[in-house]
Amino acid sequence: MNIAVSPSAEEPSARTQVQWSLRWESELQLADHAELADFFRKSYGPTGAFNAQPFEGIRSWAGARPEMRVIGYDAHGVAAHIGLLRRFIKIGGVDLLVAELGLYAVRPDLEGLGISHSMRVMYPALQELGVPFGFGTVRPALEKHLTRLVGRRGLATLMPGIRVRSTQADVYPNLSPIRIEDVLVVVFPVGRSMGEWPAGTIIDRNGPEL
């Protein structure tokens, strides 16, 4: 899960009134992509220039392209974003349909617009799509932060010690086409319980990260 978030972000700020919008990818116009690309550059830039590079121009996605987005707007424009893409992943030889969640970001000037708030909007959409699980990956360093935001609230289960194999977003002559990462897996039970999540310590995305 591409994620840009302040470590102090836990509760919604009283300084901003955010309106949430659920958008299918085909509903977005060029102006929407341009606004989102600018938002991502400003959100991911502080985490490293490399993380902002995919959003040059008006490109509003980094790896795989989402099919649905939850976008938070306030008086200053885009305030927060999370994307969704349905796909099959493979765990221990089992093919599993999931809704991958990624492209999560909060505008740097907003403290406290936590992922739990965007998930309150996204969760009903996951239920309508009929997926068994929502799925995402983050850096292990964010485990304590995600535990505060979604783990303790019962929104998700965090699974450390998992390796995820993905493809690069593009083909590069000087890089392997495959990426293998040790990440923290975040699972949102939707149509099934966590007891039905397949056992395994390696997940194949068979495609690029969202």
Curated annotation (Swiss-Prot):
Its main location: cytoplasm. PROSITE patterns: NODA. One of its GO terms (molecular function) is acyltransferase activity. It holds the Pfam family NodA. Its EC number is 2.3.1.-. GO terms for cellular component: cytosol. It is found in: Cytoplasm. Keywords: Acyltransferase, Cytoplasm, Nodulation, Transferase. It comes from the Bacteria. HAMAP family: NodA. Belongs to the NodA family. This is Nodulation protein A. It comes from Bradyrhizobium elkanii. The gene is nodA.
